[in-house]
């Protein structure tokens, strides 16, 4: 059994209320995520760890070699084709793939001119998905003919061309350096967060750009899982034997006194105030239990009002989507208005 005194090493640390996703800017290639409050210093610790893992350790798919009929090496040209082989290889490196298997897949292009060949013209089986079918690969003139075979697979990080050489490949097979990572860029910023009257906590803002083969929110989840799995070996006790955390009744918990204030004190715009009144939201405690989705369903309540309320709540160390058990409590803090 883990000593209850020892568990205070991690149980006494403040934990984020949850991960907030910026729904306005969220897309299949970009996401902004905010976690607060964090203990001082944890913003940089977590932000830097997640950034490094996102950029280096997530799996993706890429073309790793190509064999073109009539071509022996990458410095040759193909009759009646506008691009030389070097340019074609550069274009192949930018083809975005999803491969739903761990097997090496064979892709083909078989075309006669005149025509433009795009990524969508690649012949593949049902386990391979081309994510940018409009991407240009080459242009064939009248009388031209192209037959090429490529290999593609899943991998991690950047792999140079010489590492993609496979013994026994046919003569004329050209290995390609592959960038498997689905992550294009990661930024993070650490600012101050407020908890009650204290402002010496961290707020972590994380921005993630992907190639579209993985959703930004999934990418962050995968990176966090990798970090968690790697750190688990350092825990030298059985977490199952850890004593259950004592849950105090709501009356005994120290509630943020702002929860008992009327929403009229928030000095909101007329539109936002009217929306809260129509939704029968009287106190800040009532308000913070609403999710963003629930608020947006309120009549005449839009994104501008949502942003206004989120900013005001953040200044109080509060946010939408909080869970307050048995609200309102039987006894309000001394000096707080009755609800």
UniProtKB/Swiss-Prot annotation:
Assembly and interaction partners: Homodimer. The RNAP catalytic core consists of 2 alpha, 1 beta, 1 beta' and 1 omega subunit. When a sigma factor is associated with the core the holoenzyme is formed, which can initiate transcription.
Name of the featured protein: DNA-directed RNA polymerase subunit alpha
Catalytic activity: RNA(n) + a ribonucleoside 5'-triphosphate = RNA(n+1) + diphosphate
UniProt gene name: rpoA
Stored HAMAP family: RNApol_bact_RpoA
Entry's family note: Belongs to the RNA polymerase alpha chain family.
Location of the region described as Alpha C-terminal domain (alpha-CTD) in the Swiss-Prot/TrEMBL record: 255-339
Swiss-Prot/TrEMBL domain comment: The N-terminal domain is essential for RNAP assembly and basal transcription, whereas the C-terminal domain is involved in interaction with transcriptional regulators and with upstream promoter elements.
Name of a matching Pfam family: RNA_pol_A_CTD
NCBIfam families, per database record: PRK05182.1-2, PRK05182.2-1, PRK05182.2-5, rpoA
GO MF annotation list: DNA binding; DNA-directed RNA polymerase activity; protein dimerization activity
Spans annotated as Alpha N-terminal domain (alpha-NTD): 1-238
Provenance organism: Anaeromyxobacter sp. (strain Fw109-5)
Enzyme class: transferase
EC number: 2.7.7.6
Domain of life of the source: Bacteria
